Amino acid sequence: MMGIQERKKREKERRRQQIMIAAKRVFSTKGFNKATMEDIAKEAELSPGTLYLYFKNKDELFSSLSIRILQYLNIRLGHVADNRKRLTVDQKIEALREAMHDVYKFDPLMLINMFHLQSSETLKNLSSDLIADIKKLSRNSLTIIARLFDEEIHNGAVIDKPAMVLADIIWSMFSGIVLWEESKKMIEGDKDFLEKTLDTAFDIFRRGIKTKLLKKTL
């Protein structure tokens, strides 16, 4: 009996992954607004009805793809946190910049979509479980970043401001630059200044949050 149940579970997960792979292709070529569940079903070689057994609507399918980028972000930030004891303030901020740029390179489209998702009405159309997952992953990312700053605030290396506020600023800076650089491509073609802009932004942030004592070493 357990063997049958296990096979059914694996088959369900395989079908779910099949749908998500097809959805990513369709969203990449048509964009979210023009893509339909019928387009995705055709790409996955499944009936539209089958898709609705796994995802209640297009918004939920789109958001499920975006969760993957949040999961990867959590993993990369976790790597920074694991090494925090042997990193200086400068090295921590540089490690954060590298982690975030790495997440962008991992899947630019899904990262951009995720940032749009978090600032849109789409969240209202998602299941409570999916919303909970998105909130949990986002909160975990911010908590990891805040803890990195909290340690430096306590030892006097960073200005005495709430660590979560500094984490929010880092997150806002990252998402804002990604979205702005993407919009600039519509005007300036395929020129990509994201890495250079991100470098400059993190450098300004780093200089701004360090205490006067440490600034003398700049």
Model-derived segments and their meaning:
Residues 18, 22, 26-64:
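Helix-turn-helix
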Residues 29-33, 107, 155-156:
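Short coil/turn segments at alpha/beta junctions that flank glycine-rich nucleotide-binding fingerprints
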Residues 64, 68, 79-109, 166-170, ...:
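Hydrophobic alpha-helical connector segments
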Residues 12, 20, 62, 66, ...:
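Amphipathic, non-transmembrane alpha-helical scaffold segments
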